[in-house]
């Protein structure tokens, strides 16, 4: 899926294949992207995958925390609103894997700043939203 939707300025939601293993800049530069559901099969996500996206939330379904390409930046770094202020977004992970994400070297920073949440919290935070798998 390398570069599949890269730079798509109108994409707000996308359904990714359930067999996807590697997200390699598939959504980089998709600035209108508001939400994403990352399938259970994903093992790697590109650095800055969601840079400049208008992300409200991401649902990350893999039980094992995915690794990041190019470890300097994380996929969810540099998410800004239209005034270039850091956007407040949440990353929801499976409840039974939350502790593993929270202690993971790559994901723990999101937990420290309150961006990482259990998937069961999604319905409370977004009562009018439904996510697709």
Annotate each language-model stretch with its function:
Residues 72-82:
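BRCT (BRCA1 C-terminal) domain core and associated BRCT-interaction motifs
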Residues 7-21, 31-44, 53-67, 84-97, ...:
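Structural signature of tandem-repeat unit edges
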Residues 28, 51, 73, 99-116, ...:
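Surface-exposed repetitive/solenoidal architectures
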Residues 24, 46, 101:
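Short acidic, gly/pro-rich beta-turn/loop elements at beta-sheet edges
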